[in-house]
Regions:
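Hydrophobic packing within well-folded, soluble alpha/beta domains
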Residues: 53, 79-80
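Conserved active-site segments centered on acidic
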Residues: 1-74, 140-147
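Phosphate-binding/catalytic loops
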Residues: 78, 84-147
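Hydrophobic beta-strand core positions in alpha/beta domains
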Residues: 7, 80-81
Length: 147
């Protein structure tokens, strides 16, 4: 049974906190957290991404970036990453977690979520939109798993 979900990106200041917020809102019975493989520990969500997410109706919470590690990985029942290289990195560094690590776009044709950090407003909007879309698909799938 799934009770804890972890979203992971590179720095934990853009994609994974937005996915965390969408999943948390849609799955109130689950614990949803986020982390970064190369986290900018303690930093909040990038202000431009936060503004873009809020404009799309995503309610963000207070956030401080945290580093993915063995303990965080062990606590999660499902680890959701943004790009294939994140999954590969986890598999190389923590092979014990590879079997529970999936792309956010897993159910959307294995779609990759491009890194919006310091990109154009259009790219940021597109990335946040993809995160919301793929997160909604995960919400549906996780609801089926927890019944």
């Amino acid at each position: 049974m799934v009770s804890q979900v972890l979203t992971v990106c590179t720095a934990n200041i853009c994609r994974s906190p937005v996915a965390e917020a969408v999943l948390r809102a849609g799955l109130p019975g689950l614990t949803v957290r986020s982390a970064g493989l190369y986290a900018l520990v303690g930093r909040g969500i990038d202000p431009e991404i936060a503004e873009t997410a809020r404009a799309q109706g995503i309610a963000l919470h207070d956030h401080a970036a945290r580093q993915f590690d063995d303990t965080i990985g062990r606590e999660a029942d499902v680890i959701i990453v943004m790009e294939t290289h994140h999954r590969q990195d986890i598999g190389q560094r923590w092979p014990q977690f590879l079997g529970k690590t999936f792309l956010l776009g897993h159910f959307d044709n294995a779609r990759q979520i491009p890194d919006p950090y310091k990109q154009t407003a259009g790219m940021q909007h597109h990335s946040v939109e993809l995160i919301a879309q793929c997160s909604r698909t995960w919400i549906h799938q996780l609801e089926q798993m927890t019944r």
